[in-house]
Amino acid sequence: MRPQMRWKLCWENELELSDHTELAEFFRKTYGPTGTFNARPFEGGHSWAGARPELRVIGYDAHGVAAHMGLLRRFIRVGDADLLVAELGLWGVRPDLEGLGLNHSIRVMYPVLQQLGVPFAFGAVRHALYKLVGRLCRNGLGTIVAGVRVRSTLSDVYLNLPPTRTEDVLVVVFPIGRPMSEWPSGTLIERNGPEL
């Protein structure tokens, strides 16, 4: 039986301290099984890991936060083209609900993306999530773009690390205001900031 989900769309300034602490706990539990390092950014009540989202879709059920997706509008560079996008990140579904939350969260977010007037939304996820993201793209909402790496700045300055990192990730693009045929070609996306 599917749990009853209640979806909340909120701007970052609308979140209370209690929202941040509840989300931080959700992210630690959701990202922790993929490695301790992945849960570390959410210590101390942080409900973001790199760049802070401007808008969030949060799914709740009887047990609290069940799913989450964050959005940040930004300019990225794909090949030689500068492009306004809505970056989608901080995707998460509580482990006991996997398979139920991501599709619903993008469906809640999609009308908002249209209202924001962005040409595309994009997200980058681990290759291990190919099946999950593939299900999302099956209905034509998005396209997995293969062979693209993403370069980002680190969220903090570390004297022992370079200021940027380039990752081989799975890139998914959602055409919003323009058709997918207008997504620029290129093998590198420059985020020009930290990942969401």
From Swiss-Prot:
| Source species taxonomy | Bacteria, Pseudomonadati, Pseudomonadota, Alphaproteobacteria, Hyphomicrobiales
InterPro entries membership: NodA, Nodulation_prot_NodA_CS
Enzyme class, UniProt record, top EC level:
transferase
Whether Cytoplasm counts among this entry's keywords is yes
CC annotations in GO = cytosol
Full protein name: Nodulation protein A
Which domain of life does this protein belong to? Bacteria
Q: Which UniProt keywords apply?
A: Acyltransferase, Cytoplasm, Nodulation, Plasmid, Transferase
Q: Hey, which family's this protein in?
A: Belongs to the NodA family.
UniProt source species: Sinorhizobium fredii (strain NBRC 101917 / NGR234)
Enzyme Commission number: 2.3.1.-
One MF term in GO for this entry? acyltransferase activity
